């Protein structure tokens, strides 16, 4: 049984190929992680007679404790599935949220570093010559690492031996926690690299070198890298007899212990690299290493601001992040030199997996930079992980065939006319790096094999063409702003049954009411007490607003535009929104294993039955027609539950984002 505290018959079974990215990643969560975060002293099966009710759902003590943990795991599984289907950053958000709630705690304390990464990239990266998405990219990397672990017995063996874990499920749970930390947060330091690249791009002249341009460097970092007394005490328990004053000290020690002898560097040499990375980028080919900032920020966030318990595995995750970009390639291994030693998983399993997955994940990455938009990048990738190997077919948009054929013609002409060793070959990034092969291996594949040891895991990279996989998924005129999405969810939940909100709505003073910080604080406390399932439901309700606006011919923006401004929806628009929101609610509940029933209200969450579900429904996918028929059978009070939140969104967008809604 994959979910021992739930009715597995009510949970969707996937038809993905077992060795595909989707099939392997979801199977990792469902099958390998059985019993994830369980308290073994409480009921571990819902068929047991003596069930505790120590878990929370809509309220505390509604369900068994381990049932809550199984529901959390199903939330994560569904979030990963939604993201792999859509590739949308809105769905990537759910994966971050689930992980933070499950393994780190209180999203409120960690939200800024995730939300700002997305906002910085969207708003600042268009000034760069080259830049592509890192927000959704990190979630793809996370899923890829789950899939490789699930399908690769060789890596599983290395991981279990390294961490001295014999039980398969315990090892998978351990991997999920620390791989999630390594992968999902490996690029959070990008806001430090973006200003550096913006200055470089501003002064860029074709044919010149970076050395001739002004550059940004970071100084006065003492407060940023210093370690407070609480963190020092935690470190002393992991490394007795050692004292550390800065994060540079910690990282240099850990890396030297793991691989200093293999790669011939000392602790002092590594510390010097780390000191100079942000302060003297001119010593590192005039590039700023975001990985350094990602690891340092995360250390401070986890062990100083949040004051969580520290384990050596946390430092493994942080040093994996630290290594994944240029530190390993150019300071440790010098990976393009004759003496290069491809990195072995046995030295640092998390670092190995992060470098491998970070290199493999180059598909479906939104291009922001001016040159990046002109290049041809894969929009999808199919994987086959069978036989402990990795076969990747990178899929390019078939609509770009004219561009590809033009490149091929140029390349053939170059081959026929070139003098040996002279003339630069034509390029079409990233297609040419995967398509052109020497001795059966593309440059793209060869670079990966120089970085990580694939002598036992055979990698095969091919190219193909297909219709755009995510066509239509990013077509809304209104784009979600993650800065206030969490606050929107808090308000949507808090207004339920709130007399103050009702009075403000009747008086037309919604914006004034929502501007009261005490009200928001009260709502935030109530939101914290919800289970992960209910928090996600409110978040996804807020995210759906852009879709509903698009459906009725409206959009929101912070720009002054010559369209009719919307202060209230028409009755017909509300009916359309209500039906669409009911379909979303139904689909969400079927995905979470709910079915139709009429239990007593206080038993509803335990039995996972609801009277607003569709009677006699036996499937998992809710069509618009089925949702509409079910919506019609509901009374007015129930229908209003689907429209009231959207009217609330009108006020919230004005209050928190300074946005206005317009009708096309």
Question: Which residues does each PLM region occupy?
Answer:
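Active-site-adjacent bridging/hinge elements
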Residues: 106-123, 261-274, 506-524, 618-626
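Acidic/His-rich, divalent-metal-binding segments that scaffold phosphate/diphosphate chemistry
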Residues: 12-223, 261-268
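Alpha-helical propensity feature that highlights long, continuous alpha-helices across diverse contexts
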Residues: 397, 411, 421-664
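C-terminal effector/catalytic modules and regulatory tails appended to multi-domain proteins
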Residues: 2-112, 340-346, 351, 357-360, ...
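Divalent metal-dependent catalytic cores for phosphoryl transfer on phosphate-bearing substrates
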Residues: 169-382
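Short, well-structured alpha-helical segments
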Residues: 135, 139, 176, 180, ...
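Phosphate/oxyanion-binding active-site loops and adjacent basic polyanion-contact surfaces
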Residues: 130-149, 183, 286-294, 534-537, ...
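Short helix/loop segment immediately N-terminal to the Walker
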Residues: 152-173, 308-310, 336-338, 507-515
